[in-house]
Amino acid sequence: MSGRGKQGGKTRAKSKTRSSRAGLQFPVGRVHRLLRKGNYAERVGAGAPVYLAAVLEYLTAEILELAWERLPEITKRPVLSPGTCNSLCNDEELNKLLGGVTIAQGGVLPNIQSVLLPKKTESSKSTKSK
């Protein structure tokens, strides 16, 4: 035969997502769609959503790592928003970066202004020295 006709049909290669090609967990396709629909620029290049997804994944990993370190090793509790919020405020760089960000269900940070604290009197100082 001359090679015409049906030979073993070509199988289609399994599709790979852009996230798996980049080695990311965050969805590159969704980030690309949001960049296009958000009117941030007239055109969006192919590398921009990959880079943005990688940055978002890195920041998320850093935040979760800080919150995870805050948990005691003995307990098997989940990472909650108040713990995440406290961990962010204790970290200097992330606090500077995310200073104006509100975390849902994060609670409030314990902070008492020095003006509101009780004043130390002379009698309390003298009783402690005796």
Curated annotation (Swiss-Prot):
Task: Outline what the protein does.
Answer: Core component of nucleosome. Nucleosomes wrap and compact DNA into chromatin, limiting DNA accessibility to the cellular machineries which require DNA as a template. Histones thereby play a central role in transcription regulation, DNA repair, DNA replication and chromosomal stability. DNA accessibility is regulated via a complex set of post-translational modifications of histones, also called histone code, and nucleosome remodeling.
* Residue numbers of N6-lactoyllysine PTMs: 10
What is the protein's species of origin?
Answer: Xenopus laevis (African clawed frog)
Q: Which residues carry this modification: N6-acetyllysine?
A: 6
What is an example of a Pfam family matching this protein? Histone
| N-acetylserine PTM positions | 2
**Origin, by domain of life?**
Eukaryota
Q: What is this protein called?
A: Histone H2A type 2
Quaternary structure note: The nucleosome is a histone octamer containing two molecules each of H2A, H2B, H3 and H4 assembled in one H3-H4 heterotetramer and two H2A-H2B heterodimers. The octamer wraps approximately 147 bp of DNA.
Name the PANTHER family for this protein. HISTONE H2A
Taxonomic path = Eukaryota, Metazoa, Chordata, Craniata, Vertebrata
Where on the chain is N5-methylglutamine found, per UniProt?
105
Q: Where N6-(2-hydroxyisobutyryl)lysine occurs, residue numbers? A: 6, 10, 37, 76, 96, 119
Q: Which GO terms describe its molecular function?
A: DNA binding; protein heterodimerization activity; structural constituent of chromatin
Q: Which InterPro entries match?
A: Histone-fold (IPR009072), Histone_H2A (IPR002119), Histone_H2A/H2B/H3 (IPR007125), Histone_H2A_C (IPR032454), Histone_H2A_CS (IPR032458)
**Where is it chiefly localized?**
nucleus
- Cellular localization per UniProt: Nucleus; Chromosome
Q: Name positions with the PTM N6-succinyllysine.
A: 10, 96
